[in-house]
């Protein structure tokens, strides 16, 4: 979409979620399933008790202290890895995956402050579906850091084949969103390939504890070899060569192509540090990197995120993002009412086929998909 139209659609959606949806809910109620009254988790994912509360909320006090704050063991591992990496590469010691969002700005600043000997190359991987606001934010934010920066945009034809295939795999997916995982795989493999070619020992990314737990299961601050496996192979049982051309295959990271020094480790420091949202915002504000009106995730999400959400609800009755965000609601990191409204709006669209945005329809067209391909009427 053109930026002006994109902004109009997002702001209209946001306005409905904030102001109008509570008034529209009674009309839409017959199309909505019950949700946990504490965290908004959908009953299709998390069965509710007689009081309308999911088991995770019933158990939250037991786990509250264990789930929050720095993990000293992981933090020590991260510190040892980053300290040892300083000066150990050829021209760079770490490829840093940069999005321009507040988490990546926070992490990059901490790396520069705490590990001044770490020679960092920032990398933005643009899959062609990034929002114009996210791209603007990244361009504006990177200018505040004295750092080398590369923006990489993979072959659009390959990207279309990849995400078209991933969307068609949604009905067979197990667990977290296969489309979102493949977006991550494209990003991580692009970074690993670059690091391997430049003999850079580390790739550093800004995944947080909740994200890692939801995507991979468990909590760890470094990718294992199993985590590196392509989800189309590991989770969907596909053979990549049957779906991608030899030219396409070069986009995927293959450990066998590289000598030992060309097998970069992938580090996730925020899993160990687990800063609060307030800490992140305070630092980003202090750096002057918080652009007023540009921080809403609806403005910065990839264009296919709403399509994933609608398709998963149509297929399973809930979507992967509800699982992640309901956990954030339980942890007090995001507000219940606003996100419950958003969840219900997506659910209504998925069940009725109504109010599907122009942006979502454009994504389908670019990927060669129909409404029926994603489960819509």
Feature annotation, model-predicted:
Residues 11-94, 110, 114-377:
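Nucleotide-activated chemistry modules centered on ATP-dependent adenylation/adenylyltransferase
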Residues 94-103:
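Short, glycine-rich nucleotide/cofactor-binding loops
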Residues 106-107:
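Hydrophobic positions on the alpha1 helix immediately C-terminal to the Walker A/P-loop
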